[in-house]
Amino acid sequence: MTGVQTCALPILIRSYAPGFIFTTSLSPVLVAGVLAAVRHLKASSVERDGQQANAAMLKAMLREAGLPVMNSTTHIVPLMVGDPVKAKTIADILLAEYGIYVQPINYPTVPRGLERLRFTPGPAHTEPMMRGLTEALTEIWQRLDLALAA
């Protein structure tokens, strides 16, 4: 084999091997940051406690506003919409008019007819932020003539 032929095989493999093309190693700085975060979270519950408290607060605010919050024992706050087009519309309005990003959850992730929005408040979210989200959702629900919780 000549040098060109010997060189062609690794190039071919690199060009067509999805395991190589779609794999990127993490930088040492990023790995160090992740390790520091894991060590911190193992030693501290401040962030977990804050996230749980904020999830409970947001659930209470949304329920108080009459919005259809689904039962959840986790930090995820699911809000039932029940229609994929309306879920997307709500997400689009939240982003365009309020600067709030949420991903609508549609089929096949959830069964048809059970489309929803899932909010995940973090420990750094404040009560005014969550109040603003609640007010935005209340306004959007009225604008789109969506049913409130029973």
Regions found by a protein language model. Name each.
Residues 2-9:
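Short, small-residue-biased leader/transition segments that mark boundaries at the very start
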Residues 8, 27, 106-109:
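Short, ordered loop/turn segments at secondary-structure junctions
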Residues 8, 29-49, 60-65, 83:
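Amphipathic alpha-helix from the class-I
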Residues 11-26:
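Active-site PLP-lysine loop of aminotransferase-like
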Residues 12-13, 90, 129, 133:
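Hydrophobic side chains in well-ordered alpha-helices
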Residues 17, 45, 55-56, 137:
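Short amphipathic alpha-helical/adjacent loop interface patches that line ligand
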Residues 48-58, 63-99, 107-109, 114, ...:
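Conserved PLP-binding catalytic core of the aspartate aminotransferase-like
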Residues 96-97, 109-150:
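PLP-dependent enzyme catalytic core of the Aspartate aminotransferase-like
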